[in-house]
Amino acid sequence: MFGELGVPEVLFILGIALLIFGPKKLGDLGKGLGEGVRGFKSALRDEPKKEETKA
């Protein structure tokens, strides 16, 4: 379903989002999303590996 989105469709969706949220709010949303993804990747990378205990 989503695999068939082309460049025109993505641009249309971004244009609608720009109209709804405005340029400043859209930039803030993108910044927050980027920081969240960066934090998630950092947490995955820094997670200590748990040792399996033999019973």
Curated annotation (Swiss-Prot):
Its main location: membrane. GO terms for cellular component: TAT protein transport complex. The chain crosses the membrane at residues 1-21. It is a single-pass membrane protein. It is found in: Cell inner membrane. One of its GO terms (biological process) is protein transport by the Tat complex. GO terms for molecular function: protein transmembrane transporter activity. The keyword Transport applies. The keyword Acetylation does not apply. Keywords: Cell inner membrane, Cell membrane, Membrane, Protein transport, Translocation, Transmembrane, Transmembrane helix, Transport. Forms a complex with TatC. NCBIfam families: tatAE. PANTHER family: SEC-INDEPENDENT PROTEIN TRANSLOCASE PROTEIN TATA. Belongs to the TatA/E family. Part of the twin-arginine translocation (Tat) system that transports large folded proteins containing a characteristic twin-arginine motif in their signal peptide across membranes. TatA could form the protein-conducting channel of the Tat system. This is Sec-independent protein translocase protein TatA. It comes from Koribacter versatilis (strain Ellin345).
